[in-house]
Regions:
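Residue-level detector of functionally pivotal "anchor" positions at catalytic/ligand-binding pockets or at interdomain
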Residues: 336-361, 366-367
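Surface-exposed repetitive/solenoidal architectures
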Residues: 21-345
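Short, glycine-anchored, charge-dense loop/turn motifs used at functional sites
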Residues: 375-382, 402
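Bacterial Sec-dependent N-terminal signal peptides
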Residues: 1-24
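Short beta-strand/loop motifs in extracellular/secreted proteins, especially
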Residues: 368-373
């Protein structure tokens, strides 16, 4: 009887562990990180985060837990292999809901891709959700050394603002480091759409990363790295080479409106570049293909620390009309076909209105009164006005490339000389 009991108890410890959601639980390392080696492991981790209770952690850095500290879900994970989600519909890890609990789930742990990639990501609109991506909401958390290869992330803002990106929908007091994406990210007029994250709030940052995926938002905020950036956020040493319907690094920054009262400062966009044919003096600099290759090789793909936490393997290369960019594996590169303007099309969306640039003026003809927003090539809103029907002119803008966005869906790039 004792032997039978012994073997029964042993079986409890060696048999695979399944969650209430049906996925196999991954093992943990000595530091408590879950070791993710399959799609089932990643689903299990997602479900654990989304179902876990928030805990109060020392978010203000004073070494104590007090009422000023935020609550987050602090689970940690590492990828130990490339993951293929197979195009199955993905529910994001965490959820942003404008700070409203209990619907909000703030991922505040560490997620280290360790130089691996996730393929087959497929995120589709979900009723009531405001944030879309591999992660819906990263708050006080870190995502690093991770690539998103292919796949689609799509949102549809029926009930208000939505935030959509390949890595995260919303980033707040969190960090994205050493990441890249080639996914297609798309949304609608009310959304903020970015190649890596939809929005950045508070003291959040993205560094040493790039986007080579398409970002689509014909009449709303769109950026190659982030769709929206708050005044305390920062983007450092980041690059965009994917097609974007407006903006290049950041689609919009909310500090633009509050700057008028002097209450905020501009967000920090430092050493950021995008592949473009023309540009103006902005926070992010447009580079020709050859200059882009030189810069990204010097600043992103050169290891400053002799291998310590440096995931990139290889150098960017320009051959004919194709730009090749390295990933974490020398046998796998991202190829970007070049055209005259890879970050914006001449006419992004067609509408009932007519827009053109004449002698340094933006001339607009509309059939009815409507609002218009002018965005510079770095993605910052530089002017917002309401037009009457008929013919109108906008003057006083500096020379450069702008995206003119009308509320009827018209979105056109113009060059002021």
């Amino acid at each position: 009887m004792m032997n039978k009991l012994y073997f029964y108890c042993l079986a409890l410890f060696v048999a695979p562990t399944f969650s209430a959601f049906g996925q196999t639980q991954p093992s943990q390392d000595e530091n408590g990180y879950y070791l993710i080696e399959s799609a089932e492991h990643l689903k299990w981790f997602r479900d654990q985060v989304n179902a876990s209770e928030h805990e109060q952690v020392d978010t203000n850095g004073d070494g104590q837990i007090n009422m000023d500290d935020d609550t987050v879900v602090r689970l940690n994970a590492k990828l130990t292999a490339d993951i293929d989600l197979g195009g199955e519909s993905w529910t994001p890890i965490g959820e942003y809901n404008n700070g409203e609990e209990p619907d909000e789930v703030r991922f505040g742990g560490y997620f280290d891709g360790q130089g691996h990639v996730i393929k087959g990501l497929n995120v589709q609109p979900i009723d009531g959700r405001q944030s879309y991506g591999l992660f819906g909401y990263v708050a006080w958390g870190v995502v690093k050394n991770l690539g998103i290869v292919g796949g689609t992330v799509t949102s549809k803002a029926d009930d208000g603002q939505e935030y959509t990106g390949a890595i995260s929908g919303m980033l707040s007091y969190g960090r994205i480091e050493n990441c890249f994406s080639t996914a297609t990210v798309s949304g609608t007029a009310e959304g903020s759409i970015g190649g890596l994250t939809g929005g950045m709030r508070k003291i959040s940052s993205i560094s040493n990363s790039y986007n080579a995926g398409t970002v689509i938002n014909p009449s709303g905020m769109a950026g190659g790295i982030t769709g929206y950036i708050g005044s305390d956020a920062s983007v450092y040493n980041c690059y965009n080479m994917g097609k974007v319907t407006g903006g290049a690094i950041s689609g919009d920054d909310y500090s633009e409106s509050t700057l008028r009262s002097g209450e905020e400062e501009l967000p920090s966009i430092i050493d950021c570049y995008y592949l473009e044919g023309a540009g103006s003096g902005t926070l992010a600099k447009a580079l020709s293909a050859s200059d882009f290759v030189t810069t990204i090789n010097e600043k992103l793909f050169t290891d400053p620390n002799n291998g310590e936490d440096f995931p990139w393997d290889g150098k960017a290369n320009l051959a004919g009309d194709r730009l090749s960019v390295p990933t974490f594996d020398s046998s796998s590169v991202v190829e970007v076909p070049l055209d005259d303007d890879p970050t914006a099309t001449e006419t992004i969306a067609k509408g009932e209105s007519h827009i053109q640039a004449i002698d340094g003026r933006i001339c607009i003809t509309t059939s009815e009164p409507m609002k218009v927003r002018v965005v510079n090539i770095a993605g910052q809103t530089v002017r917002t006005v309401s037009l009457s029907d008929g013919y109108s002119e906008m003057t006083g803008l500096a020379e450069g490339v702008y995206i003119v966005v009308l509320e009827d869906g018209t979105c056109v790039k113009v060059l002021l000389r």
